[in-house]
Amino acid sequence: MDDVVKSLLQRTTSSLTKPAPARPSREEAEAAVEVLLRWTGDDPSREGLRDTPKRVVKAFEEFFSGYNADASDVLSRVFEEVHGYDNMVLVRDIPFSSHCEHHMVPFFGVAHIGYYPSEAGVIGLSKLARLVDIFAKRLQTQEALTAQIIGAIDEHLQPRGCAIMLEAEHMCMSMRGVQKHGTSTLTTQFTGVFKNDPAEQVRFFGMVRNPKS
C-alpha cells in the first residue's frame, strides 16, 4: 500500500480500532435531539416537531450506516472469468453524500475510480459504488474519505495501481462561514503505476473529463 495512503489511514482509522464507547439507547438519542430543539429556541412539543426526534434518529441510522458495514465483505469476490484483462477499469461519476465530521453538515458530489487489475481478476462494477457508500456513510473529511476508499481497494484487490478523484460541495462552506455557494473541492490519490507514471495520471484525468477521447 502507498506510504502516503497508509499514513493517512492510520490517523483516520485509529479511532475505529479503539474499543467503542457504549452506544446510547434509541430513547437517549431521541432525548438528545429534543434537547437540541429546545436549545434552538423552539418548542419540541408543538405539532410540527413532536415526532422530529424519532425522525432524526431514523435518518441518522441511514446517514451513518457505514459504521455497520465492512469493506472486506464488498471486495471479497472477484470475477476470474475475465482473467487476462490488463487495461484500466474506470467507473466515473459515482454519486455520494457524506457528513463533515467538524460540523455534521452534508457534503456531496461524485467519485471517479480507476484501477489496473491484478492477475486475480476484476471486481464487480457495483461493488465500487457500494465501497464508496460504506465510507461516505460515516462522519468524514473528504481527504480521509479519499484515502479510505483507495486504501481498501489496495488492501483487498492488490491492483497494479489505483487512482481516485472526489469532487464535492461542502455545506459547511456553502451554508455557513464564508457562504460560497457552488464551490467544489477536489481530492486525488494515486498508488502503483498511477503514482509512478505521470502519463497514467494524465490518462486517468483524460478519461474522467472526456470519456470519448
UniProtKB/Swiss-Prot annotation:
Family annotation (PROSITE patterns): GTP_CYCLOHYDROL_1_1, GTP_CYCLOHYDROL_1_2
PANTHER family: GTP CYCLOHYDROLASE 1, GTP CYCLOHYDROLASE I
Known EC number: 3.5.4.16
Binding site residues for Zn(2+): C100, H103, C172
Top-level lineage group: Bacteria
Family under the similarity heading: Belongs to the GTP cyclohydrolase I family.
GO MF annotation list: GTP binding; GTP cyclohydrolase I activity; zinc ion binding
Keywords: GTP-binding, Hydrolase, Metal-binding, Nucleotide-binding, One-carbon metabolism, Zinc
UniProt GO BP: one-carbon metabolic process; tetrahydrobiopterin biosynthetic process; tetrahydrofolate biosynthetic process
Keyword Metal-binding (UniProt): yes
Assembly and interaction partners: Homomer.
GO CC aspect terms: cytoplasm
Class of this enzyme: hydrolase
HAMAP family (alphabetical): FolE
Pfam families linked: GTP_cyclohydroI
Pathway(s) the chain acts in: Cofactor biosynthesis; 7,8-dihydroneopterin triphosphate biosynthesis; 7,8-dihydroneopterin triphosphate from GTP: step 1/1
Protein name per Swiss-Prot or TrEMBL: GTP cyclohydrolase 1
Region ranges (Disordered): 1-27
Catalytic activity, as annotated: GTP + H2O = 7,8-dihydroneopterin 3'-triphosphate + formate + H(+)
